[in-house]
Structure formats: structure tokens, C-alpha cells
Amino acid sequence: MATRIIVSYDDTDNDRDALALGRLLAFSGADLSLAYVRHSQGGALEEKEAEDLLARGAESVGAPEMPRHVVVNPGTSVGLAELAEREGADVIVFGSEYRTAPGTVKPGIPAHKLLLGGPAAIAVAPAALRDNPSVSINTIGVIDEGDPAARETAESLGAALGATVAERAGAGHIDFLVVGSRPESPAGKVTLSAASDYAVETASFPVLVVPRGRPVEFAPLAPASPSDPDESAGPAEPAIA
């Protein structure tokens, strides 16, 4: 089964960064969908506005058929957590907080709440990632917190994207970071240590925090067939759930 990724999207610039990161991860063969959390039931007009908002996001990346979810919940983080559990999602992707300087990472309130006990891996995009369409993942760093799930996730993503996994955090340049949950975190839940929280908030590249004991298994790229007329075409287009 393909990895399932949900992008939290509300048509702001920072959530366009989240969509850019989701698309980047989807080159691994993952299934991608968009989600918007409405905080009240409202009426037919509000429902249509939410659906139109998500449709614009899907169309902006040339994927009008991308699955979209409108969730009604007073809390964005709760609504997304419930959606992830219902859909069997592996990753929820966020943009950084709206006042974040370009090229840096700062989780907003919903992302931060899910970094304190969420049921799925949490990815956060640097601000203005949307403005760098040529960005790629070539070298992946790992902070494992004593949990092999972080390195297993990094190795799986590296295999899928043809990227290298650094031997240790801080060992030279990286352009993506995978972080494990702290040792006392309940199995299957995301919880950052103070040191890892600092690493996330001082990062200048996308970050993925994985639940304790539950690696994200990205699909490896299929080897090119000898008869393929264009073996140099690069990764296939991201999958749509």
C-alpha cells in the first residue's frame, strides 16, 4: 500500500509551501490529498467555499483530480488527527507559521499540537518553499532519539528518491531532516524532546517527525526497464490518491 500524505491547506502562502513539500514527498510514490478544517458547520455556501478553496489548491499543481477533504471541527489539529486516523494517513504536512522568515521552519499552533501526541508523522515546510520549484531531496539527516523508526524512515525515503542518508546529524550539508520521537513517547505517537524541538525550529530545510516505533515506509522507485525509451526522464509524477 502506498504511503498516504495529507496536506493541511487553506490557500495561504504558507500552506502553498506545505503543498510544495507534499508534492516533493509524493515523488516517492505516495498518495497525496488536501484537507481543510472548518471550525463551524455553517451552511451550503461555506461548504462550497471550502470545497472551492481546495479545488484551487489541487488545480494550482496541475492535479485537479487530487482527493480533497473538508473537515468540520472546532480544532484544526483535532480535525486533522481524526481525519488521519480515519483515512489511515501516514503523514500530515504543514506550512510554517505565517510570520516565519523565508527559508526557515516554525511550526504553527496546529502543527505544534500534533507534535505533542499526534497519531501520524508531521512534516513542516520552510517558509517560501513554494518559490523554489527546483528544490530536491539529495541528502537526508537523522535525529533518531534512540528510536530506529527515524533512520528506517530516512532510508526508505532515500531509496525512493535516490537520496543519501547522512551517517549522523550535523555531518555536512543536508536538505531534509527526519526526527524521531522521544523515548518516553507512547508507541505510535509523535512527541518531540526539547533538543529535537530546537532542531526543528532552527532548520532551514523540510522536517519530518515520525511517531515512536512506527517508521514511514515510502515506496522505492521501480528500476527502469532496459527497453524504456527514456530512462533519463527522472521520477514519475506524484501519485494521486
Which residues make up each language-model segment?
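Charged docking surfaces used in two-component/phosphorelay signaling
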Residues: 70-79
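Acidic, proline/glycine-rich short linear motifs
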Residues: 24-58, 167-171, 215-241
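Charged helix-capping and loop-helix junction motifs
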Residues: 49-53, 106-111, 190-196
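Short, conserved loop/helix-junction motifs that constitute active-site signature segments
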Residues: 24-29, 158-161, 201-202
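Intrinsically disordered or low-complexity boundary/linker segments at protein termini
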Residues: 1-17, 90-102, 106-107, 112-155, ...
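Short glycine-rich, flexible loops that bind phosphorylated cofactors or substrates
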Residues: 100-101, 185-187
